[in-house]
């Protein structure tokens, strides 16, 4: 890599993110001349930020910008184009290309925890950009059925625009896998499946990583189910980000450093 590089995270809020601690520690230990910066960018200033983001080599994208950023980009990778959701932007001279690493993060987490998707009945809470990515992944990997739990089925139908899925404002049936794609559970607050009585042997997957053990996952485990933490998804995303931006994949240290960074930020 020639010269130094500034990369970062944009979203609102970003105070719960461990990225700044984690990536800067990795850069230091691996001798990479780069700095990671978390930036709280409100929706109404996104256009102005992007216009003046020339100082960034790349940046991760989180809520609420994963979809709204797309019109400002020059190109998308295949998965970002399919899902209409971006969580990494890489600047190549004057052009900005959007990538979807959420897909790879989910694949990493499910492989790490040995969760099979084929022929499973799956329900996903949420209808935003990350939900589109999870739906796409589940369909690509042979899910028997994919339903979406949402507060507003009409809005979800418009936002998702994916054929072959069911949209529900409440659920009263059993599924093999439950996935949280909402912010509920962040910092320990809320559970999108609070009205569901989980059965033994089911699987809960949470995209929230702070805390790594959300109220939803605790209830699933107490019911005799198994759980996949959002931290595993985050680790997969992070490894893919470093691979795309710097051509490195530090598997041996990333998980250890991610856990340390999460513990550090949770202590305040």
Curated annotation (Swiss-Prot):
Gene Ontology molecular function: any one: shikimate 3-dehydrogenase (NADP+) activity
Keyword Transmembrane: no
Cellular component per GO, a single term: cytosol
Positions annotated to bind shikimate: 62, 87, 102, 209
Keywords: Amino-acid biosynthesis, Aromatic amino acid biosynthesis, NADP, Oxidoreductase
Keyword Ligase assigned: no
InterPro entries noted in UniProt: Aminoacid_DH-like_N_sf (IPR046346), NAD(P)-bd_dom_sf (IPR036291), Shikimate_DH-bd_N (IPR013708), Shikimate_DH_fam (IPR022893)
EC number: 1.1.1.25
EC category name: oxidoreductase
Top-rank lineage group of the source organism: Archaea
Active site annotation, chain numbering: 66
Positions contributing to NADP(+) binding: 78, 126-130, 207, 230
Pathway entry: Metabolic intermediate biosynthesis; chorismate biosynthesis; chorismate from D-erythrose 4-phosphate and phosphoenolpyruvate: step 4/7
Catalytic activity: shikimate + NADP(+) = 3-dehydroshikimate + NADPH + H(+)
Entry's Gene Ontology BP terms: amino acid biosynthetic process; aromatic amino acid family biosynthetic process; chorismate biosynthetic process; shikimate metabolic process
Functional note: Involved in the biosynthesis of the chorismate, which leads to the biosynthesis of aromatic amino acids. Catalyzes the reversible NADPH linked reduction of 3-dehydroshikimate (DHSA) to yield shikimate (SA).
Quaternary structure annotation from Swiss-Prot or TrEMBL: Homodimer.
Annotated family: Belongs to the shikimate dehydrogenase family.
PANTHER family: BIFUNCTIONAL 3-DEHYDROQUINATE DEHYDRATASE_SHIKIMATE DEHYDROGENASE, CHLOROPLASTIC, SHIKIMATE DEHYDROGENASE
Name of this protein: Shikimate dehydrogenase (NADP(+))
Source organism of the structure: Thermoplasma acidophilum (strain ATCC 25905 / DSM 1728 / JCM 9062 / NBRC 15155 / AMRC-C165)
